[in-house]
Amino acid sequence: MSLSRARALALLAGSVLLPSCAFDASRVRVGSKNFTESFLIAEIYAQALERAGMRVERIFNLGSTEIALAAMRRGNIDLYPEYTGTALIDVLHRAPIPNAQQAYRIVSQIFKQRFEIVWLSPSPMNDSQGLATTSEIAASRRIRTLSEVAVAAPQLRLATIQEFLSRPDGLPGLQRAYGGFAFASVRTYDIALKYTALLEGKADIASAFTTDGAIFSDRLVVLEDDRHFWSAYNVAPVVRQAALASRPQIARVLNAVSPAITDRAARTMNAQIESAQEDPADVAAAFLKSLKLTGART
């Protein structure tokens, strides 16, 4: 399927949430949110299930976390990829937890009790927030950690997105955790353009998500969160209990795939889609083919 057709179908599917509906055991409905990495990982899940012989319906581009979770609870979708940090902070309104195992344990327990949603095995991929720079700036300014950026900030220009300036796990939280971070200038951009500003010399530091494709394609440096401020954001399939009870093999299939979705793999695949303009379905297919999973159908 071409990228344009996939996007058109995704937009159509995600534009309206249907009324609540009963579980349809003849197919597995896989959802996604409205950004590249969510499309990609949802497509990996969908193709893995298809390779195992299941019928899959894709309901992508649902929008925000709130919309995706509502679709799950209504029974409009059976599973989608979610991040532990997003569930912890945006859904459960808890404080950030840097420890990946602890964050996963909390969200999996509460989601099962409160929403009848099961978290399957998480991937090692951790799409946390971060600050990035070029290797040249990191070397010339001698900045490797966030503590060093906090001190050097009055001589540095920040490129970021608007919400980073107000979120508790954005700039205000960094200032509380590290002190400093009084940048010489702060300018806001669209998500992709903040990296352009960095590469064109209009900024010295950019806010980042640590699996962004630009980090791989532009060879950027992610600065070390040496005080472990940011929460873990490991991705995992979240599945309705009713769907899992009817098709327990969903867990076996997706738990076999999740360990292979690493930071490096995610950055590479995101770059293939965003920079090289490859079709997410093709990228997902190549990834699954490389795994050579036993029992998969081709």
Model features per residue range: what roles?
Residues 1-14:
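N-terminal secretory signal peptides and thylakoid transit peptides that target proteins
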Residues 129-139, 234-247:
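A bilobed periplasmic-binding-protein/Venus flytrap-type ligand-binding module shared by bacterial periplasmic
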